[in-house]
Regions:
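Left-handed beta-helix
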Residues: 6, 11-12, 17-24, 29-30, ...
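Conserved catalytic-core motifs of eukaryotic protein kinase domains, centered on the activation segment
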Residues: 1-2, 26, 61
Length: 62
């Protein structure tokens, strides 16, 4: 049986590009852009842009 700890938590105003995959119980902050075909395997801080396999930070806005 799955618990709520086994799912991804996605913040507000998040854009997830086509084909992107979110793997595991990660937390994605608010106002994040995930590039197309990216694979997210770790938590992403708010106000950032990530892309790649695995997803890496391209930009972090304060």
């Amino acid at each position: 049986r799955k618990s709520r700890n086994d799912v991804a938590v996605i913040g507000n105003e998040v854009y997830i590009g086509a084909g992107a995959k979110i793997i595991g119980p990660v937390k994605i902050g608010d106002k994040v852009t995930v590039g197309a075909n990216s694979v997210v395997t770790h938590d992403i801080v708010s106000n950032s842009v990530v892309a790649g396999i695995p997803a890496k930070y391209l930009e972090v806005n304060e």
